[in-house]
């Protein structure tokens, strides 16, 4: 993709919900500051204050959005404190999905280096973004050109993320939003890991339940599968928490399971090993949850 979209875009992700006017206030200010902006709602129903969940929803976005998009992403438990947001320009958008490719028709739309900005609380929300895409520059968001001189203390998602994101979308220089941050100043959490043994056995954890479908997502990435010599058609034994065993071939999609309700193991659209039932929930009937251990061997 060689050109930015002709209008500014803000992709907005928050934990604000949609049962009141909070999101509308943020979007109204975005459109007041950058009057020709297109605001895309990514998600506003994540679990409040769950930084790791929020990180999962924002890491894949660059390969779906036009170059020049500003990603305004927020869950702000430190609202009202001296905490400030961080704005980063990512280095090079990573390919993704089950097949490690660009999104779009044909071969998809390749992205350019340095073509996206994220703004978020400096609380770890950008951990996986920085891990997957890298970054070229990062700044504390503190200039009163882009944030209120006296921010509303109970609504930093609006004051410290939504408002400055609109200024950035309108062309305000990233390097002027505040002081440049050292890498050590950017807060990160430790993402769930996966390991591959010399024998090709894999281990990880359940990272998410894919609501509302009840599919099980794990921390085992397609790269881990390739390292273990696992591909589509490989017969696998998968054990969750040493209790729930499954013996299935790795399949490209749900319909390969056969009948409705039959189990299937696949690589999800984010590139991670997952378990499901064809057109039925796996997690809810069996009370499967995030954090359960996952062990994978060839059967």
Swiss-Prot record:
It catalyses: fluoride + S-adenosyl-L-methionine = 5'-deoxy-5'-fluoroadenosine + L-methionine. It comes from the Bacteria. It holds the Pfam family SAM_HAT_N. S-adenosyl-L-methionine binds at residues 15, 20-22, 76, 157, 210, 215, 269-270, 277-279. Optimum pH is 7.2. InterPro entries: Fluorinase (IPR030978), SAM_HAT_C (IPR046470), SAM_HAT_N (IPR046469), SAM_OH_AdoTrfase (IPR002747), SAM_OH_AdoTrfase_C_sf (IPR023227), SAM_OH_AdoTrfase_N_sf (IPR023228). The keyword Oxidoreductase does not apply. It is an enzyme of class 2 (transferase). Optimum temperature is 65 degrees Celsius. Exhibits excellent thermostability, suggesting that this enzyme is a promising candidate for biocatalytic applications. GO terms for molecular function: adenosyl-fluoride synthase activity. Catalyzes the formation of a C-F bond by combining S-adenosyl-L-methionine (SAM) and fluoride to generate 5'-fluoro-5'-deoxyadenosine (5'-FDA) and L-methionine. Belongs to the SAM hydrolase / SAM-dependent halogenase family. This is Fluorinase. It comes from Actinopolyspora mzabensis.
């Amino acid at each position: 993709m060689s050109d930015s979209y002709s209008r500014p875009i803000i992709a907005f992700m928050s934990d604000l919900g949609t049962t009141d006017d909070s999101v509308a206030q943020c979007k109204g200010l975005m459109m007041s500051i950058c009057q020709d902006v297109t605001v895309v709602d990514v998600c506003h129903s994540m679990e409040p204050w769950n930084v790791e969940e929020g990180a999962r929803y924002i890491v894949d976005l660059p390969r779906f959005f036009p170059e020049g998009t500003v990603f305004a992403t927020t869950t702000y438990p430190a609202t009202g404190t001296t905490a400030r947001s961080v704005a980063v320009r990512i280095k090079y958008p990573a390919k993704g999905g089950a097949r490690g490719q660009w999104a779009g028709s044909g071969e998809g739309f390749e992205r350019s280096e340095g073509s996206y900005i994220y703004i978020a609380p400096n609380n770890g929300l950008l951990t996986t973004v920085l891990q997957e895409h890298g970054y070229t520059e990062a700044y504390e968001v503190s200039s009163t050109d882009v944030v209120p001189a006296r921010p509303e203390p109970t609504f930093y998602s609006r004051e410290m993320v939504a408002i400055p994101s609109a200024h950035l979308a309108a062309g305000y220089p990233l390097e002027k939003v505040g002081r440049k941050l050292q890498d050590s100043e950017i807060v990160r959490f430790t993402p769930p890991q996966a390991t591959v043994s010399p024998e090709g056995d894999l281990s990880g954890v359940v990272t998410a339940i894919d609501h509302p479908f009840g599919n099980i997502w794990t921390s085992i990435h397609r790269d881990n599968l390739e390292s273990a010599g696992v591909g589509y058609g490989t017969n696998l034994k998968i054990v969750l928490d040493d209790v729930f065993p499954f013996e299935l071939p790795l399949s490209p999609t749900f319909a390969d399971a056969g009948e409705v309700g039959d189990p299937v193991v696949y690589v999800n659209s984010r590139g991670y090993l997952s378990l499901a039932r064809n057109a039925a929930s796996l997690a809810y009937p069996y009370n499967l949850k995030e954090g359960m251990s996952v062990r994978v061997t060839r059967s």
